[in-house]
Amino acid sequence: MSKNNHANHSNHLENHDLDNFSKTGYSNSRLNRHTMYTPEPKLSFDAMTIVGNLNKNNAHKLSEFMSVEPQIRLWDILQTKFKAKALQEKVYIEYDKVKADTWDRRNMRVEFNPNKLTHEEMLWLKQNIIDYMEDDGFTRLDLAFDFEYDLSDYYAMTDKSVKKTIFYGRNGKPETKYFGVRDSDRFIRIYNKKQERKDNADIKIMSEHLWRVEIELKRDMVDYWNDCFNDLHILQPDWKTIERTSDRAMVFMLLNDEEEWGKLERRTKNKYKKLIKEISLIDLTDLMKSTLKANEKQLQKQIDFWQREFRFWK
């Protein structure tokens, strides 16, 4: 995210309203999404990539510093390039002037997960590495919402037409859901974080459940981190409340076989997406939006920390 664009991103709003189709019959007892209590998720930036340019003088200074700094491991070192890891392998750094000139892009990249860095390590990284860069900005931000309950029974969908991929666990329930493709400007992952950590022999999680909704933003989309999932819905639709038999059968089929969506034309897809939202007691993305709104200033301070003169956020 360039510094010039920084002030403009909050003005970006998109209208994701669906076409106004005639209402399809469902139970007379209208559902109220606010009748169910759901604990707020924990919200954080889970990955960051900052790119910028090293001028010749700063490249020489940084290379000299990194070659003697014990917290840095350097390799692939030439006059116009180097790769490094820092702070116990928690930060990846790459500089390549030739590649940058060839592809007309900035020549240095720093990747890290801010959740894994202490305040002291953040300060070290900013002062000793990132502050050497000019014209720096974010090219990737991952927004992570952690829920301490089971999301395997929730139905996730988007108003937009994006690729959806589902992986199932040994119990036959969904364990990972992807929306979009990895190289797109926005890639959404919904997955069983507790199972992932168990599989990786990572930190033991005491909670009975831990699921993550992760929104990976790249390139221009990083400017809209606070308005990036208006089209996403995470629902618990009750198909049995639909009165019309044909619609009830269609919704049941769509909820249980993702491939059936591909057989519908656009207006029919939108009709049933609208109906599925209407028969759900809860949409977790409403809770995600309110959590994001409550933490927006705090998250903005984290972005400001890396890009300008700063004080630590409180």
Swiss-Prot record:
- Biased composition of type Basic and acidic residues is found at 11-20
Pfam families found in the cross-reference section? Rep_trans, RepD-like_N
Q: List keywords of the entry alphabetically.
A: DNA replication, Plasmid
List this protein's GO terms for biological process.
DNA replication
> Which residue intervals are annotated with compositional bias (Polar residues) in the record?
1-10
Q: Where is this region: Disordered?
A: 1-25
| InterPro entries per UniProt | REP-like_C, RepD-like_N
Extra information: The nicking site of REP proteins is sequence, but not plasmid, specific.
Q: What does this protein do?
A: This protein is probably a specific topoisomerase involved in initiating replication. This protein is specifically required and may be rate-limiting for replication of the plasmid in vivo.
What's this protein's family per the entry? Belongs to the plasmid replication initiation factor family.
How is this protein named in the record? Replication initiation protein
Species of origin: Staphylococcus aureus
The UniProt gene name for this protein comes to: repN
